[in-house]
Amino acid sequence: IERFAKVAHKNHLPLFVDNTFPSPVNCRPIEWGADVVLHSTSKYLDGHAMSLGGCIVDSGNFDWTKSPRHTDMCAPDESYHGLVYTEKFGKAAFIAKARAQMMRDIGMAMSPMNAFLLNVGIETLHLRMPVHCSNALAVAEFLLSNPKVAWVEYPGLKNNRYHALAGKYMPDGTCGVISFGIKGGSTRTK
């Protein structure tokens, strides 16, 4: 993550990271240089697939005045009486604009019931994620030993090409998502 952050920041661009699968329990991208972290809350954060939602976490570390692609942060917003987000909110300009202008224009407000359900899920996230990870590792190891399986992708496996990176960024576990292929392809699955 920090290599991407270095390149992005050298070019005065923010680094956005989708942290839906590992969740904040297993990976904290801001600690590695990400400026904005995104989550689909209807996955692990929710915990019971009862509500749709998303989450933006702004680190407050990015200087939006230096970004050549985000000039709207530095220009007057006529829909808010000429408000200039970078002048009023500094490094929190992005999240302020997302809350004020984007939420108003697109309607990204979660219903109270969905917010309640999300909160219930978040309360147990730290308990559920280790179990998701250990279960996924067990399934990945089983699939790896199955003669009908051509390949298995799961960064928790020691022989996975991303295992070292997963250990660095997600030392407490990766996630519960596994991908694999059947020998013989789609014709064998019918």
PLM regions and their residue ranges:
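Conserved PLP-enzyme active-site core in the AAT-like
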Residues: 1-145, 153
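Conserved C-terminal alpha-helix-loop-beta "cap" of PLP-dependent enzymes
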Residues: 129, 144, 148-190
